[in-house]
């Protein structure tokens, strides 16, 4: 089968190349003027970055379907860094088994995000800026019907009791509690740190700038090369996604600014969300400061946290084996084929 595909590739090479050229040419004709209008080249002021400290947080997770359920492990780490180096601040993690269910992977992701947000709330005061991986809107998630929860279950949210939440027997209720917890934590982070939190995305599907079939970040990577930043986009949080508890009311009234930036010539474009209305002066200050801790156009503290929390193939296999040996040791009748 694969040989047939290779043969087709050889036969169609020129046709595919022409298709790529035609798409690029079409895009250039359609939006080059907009790119020129919306992209601002900028020369970094390196003096701004000398004393700035960044707290960066990222998380990692994996889940393995097994006959007994979904074995999962999640972790999160906060680091602090400046132009002299990066060191770890805090780590947290959870490991367990969820019963099989359609939303098991979603619960794993929500649990990882809760660990990230908890570390950000705790360690954010140690730096000048907090760097969070991913977009602000994704972290906020979707509205949860709070009528399904008892007062005791809502108390789990206010106490940030993760162990209590993942002990809930009803999987759907557990998922919704995790969603609500993440909204609660985002609101606390915003109340505490406001515009000092930068939500950074390497990948974005946003099309607010150019309105083409291609994400804005792709267009900017295709048609710009120099260090710079895009036109600023002011947005409101979608109130239809905000749950109805008073502790997260701040999210209902909140504006935030989105912009794209390239921190080094020829490197990747990243997306940045920041709470409030900011102007180009603030964007330039952010670029100046981020450039002091960036490698190949990406903030190194965030990259360090990302690399530290990744579960390698070896990590995954080791965890699965440990879970299996633990079951055998503690439950003698447990057959090996169950895991």
Curated annotation (Swiss-Prot):
It comes from the Archaea. The keyword Metal-binding applies. Keywords: DNA damage, DNA repair, DNA-binding, Endonuclease, Exonuclease, Hydrolase, Manganese, Metal-binding, Nuclease. GO terms for molecular function: metal ion binding; nuclease activity. Disulfide bonds: none annotated. Its EC number is 3.1.-.-. SMART domains: NurA. Nuclease activity requires the presence of HerA. Another report shows endo- and exonuclease activity in the absence of HerA; HerA stimulates the exo- but not endonuclease. LhrC-Core (Hel112) inhibits the exonuclease activity of the HerA-NurA complex on ss- and dsDNA, has no effect on the nicking activity of NurA. Endo- and exonuclease activities are inhibited by ATP; ATP may subtract divalent ions from the reaction preventing nuclease activity, HerA can alleviate ATP inhibition. Changing residue 295 to E: Does not interact with HerA. Does not affect dimerization. Strong decrease in nucleolytic activity. Its cofactor is Mn(2+). Changing residue 300 to E: Decreases interaction with HerA. Does not affect dimerization. Decreases nucleolytic activity. The keyword Hydrolase applies. GO terms for biological process: DNA repair. Mn(2+) binds at residues 58, 133. Homodimer. Forms a complex with HerA. Belongs to the NurA family. Involved in DNA double-strand break (DSB) repair. Probably acts with HerA to stimulate resection of the 5' strand and produce the long 3' single-strand that is required for RadA loading. NurA and HerA together stimulate the end-resection of six nucleotides of a linear DNA substrate. Processes linear double-stranded (ds)DNA probes with 3' or 5' single-stranded overhangs or blunt ends. Has endonuclease activity on single-stranded (ss)DNA and nicking activity on dsDNA without HerA as well as 5'- and 3'-exonuclease activity on ssDNA. Binds ssDNA, dsDNA, forked and bubble DNA equally well. This is DNA double-strand break repair nuclease NurA. It comes from Saccharolobus solfataricus (strain ATCC 35092 / DSM 1617 / JCM 11322 / P2). The gene is nurA.
